[in-house]
């Protein structure tokens, strides 16, 4: 089970804390072009600021958050859940459950965001118009084996990967001959 956690302080501090407890975590990064002193450079920056994805059971996450709460002694919490605002808990309808992400969706997201390409961008559902909602798999190039929906973004055909409702990431341009229809098995 994968939980997404929102971190409040410095990303390296939160990641180090989770890893010190022996838990697996992932921070999605992006490669961005910047101009510094007239020179074009590629820098690494968080793709989704304040997000740290933790692969753990409910008990492990609860234990981690409890330890952080005890050690912070009333200071701002270093980590907290990111809550799923699309559903309510059955035992308490006024509260939202922590966001959990399916393993296959997380694997696909990690595969996409691990590629060193500055044209990978986070997007929202408002700017995407799926082309017939076609689900495809990329068959060639940097994004090979990434699957998602075809979309036209910034005037280019791209493949969009949805991690959870409202959290989408788009590849760089994908030519038509580098993708095929994806049939879920």
Annotate each language-model stretch with its function.
Residues 1-135, 160, 165-184:
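Acidic-enriched and Gly/Ser
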Residues 144-153:
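Short beta-strand-centered aromatic/proline hotspots
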Residues 153-159:
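Short, conserved beta-turn/loop elements at beta-strand boundaries and strand-helix junctions
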């Amino acid at each position: 089970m994968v939980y997404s956690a929102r971190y409040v302080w410095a990303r390296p501090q939160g990641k180090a804390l989770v890893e010190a407890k022996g838990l697996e975590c992932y921070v999605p990064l992006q490669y961005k072009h910047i101009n510094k002193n007239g020179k074009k450079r590629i820098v690494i920056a968080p793709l989704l600021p304040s997000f740290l994805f933790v692969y753990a059971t409910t008990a492990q996450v609860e234990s981690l958050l409890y330890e952080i709460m005890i050690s912070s002694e009333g200071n701002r919490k270093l980590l907290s859940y990111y809550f799923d605002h699309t559903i309510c808990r059955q035992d308490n309808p006024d509260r939202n459950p922590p966001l959990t992400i399916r393993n296959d969706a997380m694997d696909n997201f990690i595969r996409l965001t691990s590629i060193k390409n500055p044209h990978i961008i986070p997007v929202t559902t408002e700017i995407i118009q799926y082309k017939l909602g076609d689900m495809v798999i990329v068959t060639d190039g940097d994004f090979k084996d990434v699957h998602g929906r075809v979309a036209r973004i910034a005037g280019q055909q791209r493949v969009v990967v949805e991690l959870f409702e409202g959290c989408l990431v788009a590849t760089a341009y994908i030519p038509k001959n580098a993708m095929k229809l994806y049939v879920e098995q």
